[in-house]
Amino acid sequence: TTRYPRRLLVKNDGSCEWVGVLHEVITAKNAATSNETYVEGDYHVISGRFGARNQNPNKYLDDAHMLEEAYAQEQNQALKRRYAYYCGQSYRDCNEPALAAEWYERNIELCSKTGEEVRFSLIALGTEYRKLNDSAKTLEAWWNAYNAAPQHAEALGLIAEYLYVLERYSLGLEVAKKAATLPDPLPHATLFVNEPVHRYVIWYEL
């Protein structure tokens, strides 16, 4: 299960708008005067897959092509970065790991060197390189993900599990021990939380 915060409740006064050609996000028209609060509680959003777009057997490939075009035309750097990331996601979902990695790398080039966006993009990049059986690039991406946000254990958990697969047991154990010392991520301050890594993977490697 992947858990993430999302803006969904807004004041109906015209101060916010949806932005993006796909994977739209709610943004404030005037960021300087906007206020945002994370709502605590046992609330969940049901994500449906019932619209016409989801009946298209080539949905993810078509999405990737649309996002490529939007990326080429977009001047806003934040949206351009977002399009590159979701283009990578779309190629991932239609089982094109090489193209997915290419677009994640474009996204990473537009990100700051630290923080949530680059951390999660590097994790995604490493996952695609693992599919391509490139262990060096997989580990490089995940180490970079950890260095981008060293308070997060997720990248270390993935590294520890992969080192076990590579039969590098001693190093994997040390990485898992380090991961186990880090606190659970705060939902409102984390872009995406890969809960199985925190709940099971790290502890299994110990």
Label every model-predicted segment.
Residues 82, 116-120, 153-154, 171, ...:
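Start-of-helix register in tetratricopeptide repeats
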Residues 1-102, 112:
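Catalytic-site signature of metal-activated, phosphate-bearing donor transferases
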Residues 75-78, 112, 116, 150, ...:
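Short coil turns that delineate tetratricopeptide repeat
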Residues 79, 99, 137, 171-174:
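Alpha-helical positions within canonical tetratricopeptide repeat
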Residues 61-64, 68, 101, 108, ...:
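Tetratricopeptide repeat
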